[in-house]
Swiss-Prot record:
Similarity comment: Belongs to the Gram-positive plasmids replication protein type 1 family.
Gene that encodes the chain: rep
Species of the source: Streptococcus pneumoniae serotype 2 (strain D39 / NCTC 7466)
Protein name: Protein rep
Statement: the UniProt record of this protein carries the keyword Disulfide bond: no
Highest rank taxon of the organism: Bacteria
Keyword Lyase on entry: no
Pfam families named among the record's database cross-references: Rep_1
InterPro entries in UniProt: Rep
GO biological process, one term: DNA replication
Function: Produces a single-strand nick in a specific site of the plasmid, and this nick results in single-strand replication by rolling circle mechanism.
Length: 320
């Protein structure tokens, strides 16, 4: 049995840039989410999973003083602030790996960022609309004109809330890698924004012209890879977690229920499989990068959430 020495110290965990990882703030937001689920009458098991998310965090304190998480329970709820922070890090790391490899294999490839939208919908229509959105995306990317110069893509479904109209705006962001020939060929290869709009309207099977945006990913400041990662962020925006806003939480939870928000195609899909990258949405949220230093080098640290003091307190033990 492990014996831990009580330190009664508040957890302090900083990233490589010296910024506080703010475990406490994220935990408090997760507890707020659990309270809202309770207010909305969701089942006890769901509420309990969110309430206990990140209750105990086990780290290795390394020689340089940095902490390495090696064990924790995360609830994996679609709206959980704690889990979405972990997913965001994992997604950024995996996207970086995929893009690095794709550029090595196709150095002349160019990157585009495509946004596909539909009309805003009320909360009760959100789930069905997201299904329609992803099915329409599949139809669009099966078209010969799209496939012709496509090397690979990653797509993400995002939903934003219009507070004034009390509606939701589901849309798809797509990072595309295309052959350089996409930009040549007197109309045979290049697809204008207007043509993307027409093809998206046909794929959606709607009687209105949906908004579409297509642009090249350009090197600005951070270089090409930095611009790509900035463009392809994890598709979850923070939502206001208070009881007055509870219906938005309910609508988003029901709308995203059993929906895959991320998808890969072409070379990106092949690379992801080759690198054996785990599922960002439902997979492990402890290991979010390749920071897998020898775990035996350091001191075991356990940080436990104190519900009364509303903070994480540290206990530690030398490694046997």
């Amino acid at each position: 049995m492990e014996k831990w020495e009580n330190q009664d110290k508040i957890l302090l965990d900083k990233n490589k840039r010296g910024k506080d990882r703010n475990w406490r703030g994220r935990k408090l937001l997760s507890l707020k989410l659990a309270d809202i689920f309770k207010e909305l009458g969701y089942r006890e098991t769901l509420i309990e999973r969110v309430e206990t998310c990140g209750d105990t965090l086990r780290f290795i304190r390394r020689e340089d003083g940095s902490l390495r998480l090696y064990q924790a329970y995360f609830c994996k709820n679609k709206l959980c602030p704690m889990c979405n922070w972990r997913r965001s890090m994992k997604y950024s790391y995996q996207t970086s790996q995929i893009v690095d490899e794709a550029i090595k294999e196709q150095p002349k490839g160019r990157f585009l960022f495509l946004t596909l939208t539909v009309k805003n919908v009320p909360g009760k229509e959100l789930n069905a609309t997201i299904s329609q959105l992803t099915q329409s995306f599949d139809r669009l990317f099966r078209r010969a004109k799209v496939k012709k110069n496509l090397i690979g893509f990653l797509r993400s479904v995002e939903v934003t809330h219009n507070q004034e109209e009390e509606t939701y705006h589901p849309h798809i962001h797509v990072l595309m890698m295309v052959k350089s020939s996409y930009f040549s060929g007197a109309g045979d290869n290049y697809v204008s924004q207007e043509e993307w709009g027409r093809m998206w309207e046909q794929s959606l099977k709607v009687d209105y012209v949906p908004m579409v945006d297509i642009r090249s990913v350009k090197e600005i400041g951070k270089g090409l890879k930095g611009a790509i990662l900035e463009t392809a962020k994890y598709p979850i925006k923070p939502i206001k977690l208070d009881v007055e806003n509870k219906q938005v939480v309910g609508d988003l939870y029901n709308g995203l229920y059993r929906k895959r928000q991320l998808g890969y195609g072409g070379l990106f899909k092949e690379i992801r499989k080759r690198l054996q990258l785990s599922n960002v949405e439902n997979g492990d949220l402890v290991y979010t990068s390749d920071d897998n230093d020898e775990m035996s080098k350091g001191t075991k640290i356990v940080a436990i959430w104190n519900a009364t003091k509303q903070n994480y307190f540290v206990k530690n033990k030398g490694w046997n």
